[in-house]
Amino acid sequence: VVNKTSKADINQGKSPSQLISERIAELGDWRGEMLAKVRKLIKEADPEITEEWKWRGVPVWSDHGIVCTGESYKTHVKLTFAKGASIKDPEGIFNSGLDGNMRRAIDLYEGDKINECAFKGIICAAVKLNSSKRKK
């Protein structure tokens, strides 16, 4: 007999936004503060963005496809952009995964400051890229 657990059971009936808020609170340190800050900037850049909770605990922001994920590690918070290699980055905000053909990432460490304007520009560019791919 195979026991299947539904998503509702795993998430205890909570919305992805609630789960992301809980993750931020659980972290309880600079990583939670950083995740909260980038979440706020993402929502400011794209008020229509959808928050999702995937892969057993990874916050995901989507609009016409995945824009980015927000993973927290012991030493840093990683924002991975699914199609980051196709996004222009004139400010050099991407600092991880630079050799890949698809993804790019931003690794944020304790004390790092975010170039808010450049970050929002990357979010908008990712949404625009997702939207243009859907229309074809």
Language-model features: locations:
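Charge-dense, helix-prone N-terminal extensions
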Residues: 1-136
